[in-house]
Amino acid sequence: MCNINYHMVWSVKYRRKILKPEIEEYLQELVQQIAEDKGFTVHLFECSEGDHIHCFVSAPPKLSITAIVKYLKGITGRKLFERFPEIRNQLWKGELWNHSYYVETVGSVSEENIRRYIEHQSKSY
């Protein structure tokens, strides 16, 4: 079995600081439920400075990172607006999250180790 590890970051639209403790707690529960339903694992989830999210997940290769982000941002946005309608006053156009996000793969092998391995392979033949 194979999993790919990702570090993701995304922010609230207009960087509004709406991620208060009550919202953060509900968001944490939502993210874990989404992961369980969709087949990936959330290792770490943090709301930072009230306006952005850091999330560390593992997923099988059949589940693309774009799908994971779509699930997380789409479902949480809809559910947060339902549960906390007052946050709409600070946001408009019905969008909770910025469209963009940052993602990187995370592994235990450095670029230098990969480079050495590949260079060594070409000299073996």
Label the predicted regions.
Residues M1-Y125:
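Basic nucleic-acid-binding interfaces
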